[in-house]
């Protein structure tokens, strides 16, 4: 069954053109089932591109999903029109009374700031605490993952000497994990960040389990079983051209940037890159959504009750 999003959302047409099944409100009502409620807290500047990336992966599930777009209230977006935000987004204040089966918190290009210097950090802390009681499973991505693991466990981030940028081989450290069901032992994942968290700090925290890691780029995915929380520090959701877009943006702006590692064929930026992570991205999101379906309470109001 497909993902339910407004048919006027730009992602609707984009996903239809890719063959991803999407449905309107009218179609969803005909199916007499409870759809999974999944929210997306979109912190990225280009919100439309991120909507498409996440909806593509969530919408590939055979389960019916109602996808809600959420934004922080105390921050004015510079790269997305106010009309788009008013049409398709709700602030967290407007949805905090709700319960969600799943909730995704994206990255944001603010990783070089101290957390406490982020303009919406106070609201971010409230949102993270809220996910403990109002969300069955939270998927935190890149900066969102670093912020969450710092907020809940004090795990620090470290600034890198140069940007971690490219497509790197990663290892499956826990083949028996439900989130890695069907994964190869070794697979490619896009990386784009100026900071990192370190294994030594994570290992100090009980109940945090490292599921994916790169010998070059370090920790990629951490699972916290007690609250069904996932920390994904890299970008399995990226489009084929996402790293190229970032590279050419910086080149044209005169910002020093190395060519992304293991990305352009023959290291030639004139040759379109090949996507070598798409299948594992779909597998990861499919496993996450399947685990939601298997373990979430049927009654939404029961979500989080055991954590109170």
From Swiss-Prot:
Q: Which residues form the active site?
A: 142, 235, 237
One GO biological process term = L-methionine biosynthetic process from homoserine via O-succinyl-L-homoserine and cystathionine
InterPro entries attached here?
Class_I_gatase-like, HST_MetA, MetA_family
Q: Name one GO cellular component term.
A: cytoplasm
GO MF terms here are:
homoserine O-acetyltransferase activity; homoserine O-succinyltransferase activity
Its annotated function is as follows:
Transfers an acetyl group from acetyl-CoA to L-homoserine, forming acetyl-L-homoserine.
What CDD domains does the record tag this protein with? GATase1_HTS
UniProt-annotated location(s): Cytoplasm
Site features described as Important for acyl-CoA specificity, chain residue numbers:
111
Q: Record's SUPFAM superfamilies?
A: Class I glutamine amidotransferase-like (SSF52317)
Top enzyme category: transferase
What name has this protein been given in UniProt?
Homoserine O-acetyltransferase
The similarity comment for this entry is: Belongs to the MetA family.
């Amino acid at each position: 069954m497909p993902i339910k999003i407004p048919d006027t959302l730009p992602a609707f047409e984009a996903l239809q053109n890719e063959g991803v099944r999407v449905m309107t409100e009218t179609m969803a009502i005909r199916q007499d089932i409870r759809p999974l409620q999944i929210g997306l807290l979109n912190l990225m500047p280009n919100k439309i591109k991120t909507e498409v990336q996440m909806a593509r992966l969530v919408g590939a599930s055979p389960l019916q999903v109602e996808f809600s777009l959420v934004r922080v209230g105390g921050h004015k977006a510079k790269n997305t029109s106010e009309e788009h935000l008013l049409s398709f987004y709700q602030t967290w204040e407007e949805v905090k009374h709700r319960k969600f089966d799943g909730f995704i918190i994206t990255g944001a290009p603010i990783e070089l700031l101290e957390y406490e210097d982020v303009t919406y950090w106070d609201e971010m802390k409230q949102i993270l605490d809220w996910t403990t009681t109002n969300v069955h499973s939270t998927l935190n991505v890149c900066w969102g993952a670093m912020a969450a693991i710092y907020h809940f466990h004090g795990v620090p981030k470290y600034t890198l000497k140069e940007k971690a940028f490219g497509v790197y081989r990663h290892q499956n450290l826990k083949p028996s994990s439900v989130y890695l069901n069907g994964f190869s032992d070794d697979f490619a994942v896009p990386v784009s960040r100026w900071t990192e968290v370190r294994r030594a700090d994570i290992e100090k925290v009980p109940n945090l389990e490292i599921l994916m890691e790169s010998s070059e780029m370090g920790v990629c995915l951490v699972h916290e079983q007690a609250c069904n929380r996932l920390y994904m520090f890299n970008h399995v959701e990226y489009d084929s051209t996402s790293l190229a877009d970032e590279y050419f943006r910086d080149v044209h702006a005169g910002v020093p940037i190395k060519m992304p590692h293991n990305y352009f064929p023959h290291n030639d930026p004139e040759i379109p890159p090949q996507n070598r992570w798409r299948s594992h991205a779909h597998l990861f999101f499919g496993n996450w959504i399947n685990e939601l379906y298997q373990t979430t309470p049927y009654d939404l109001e029961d979500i989080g009750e055991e954590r109170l």
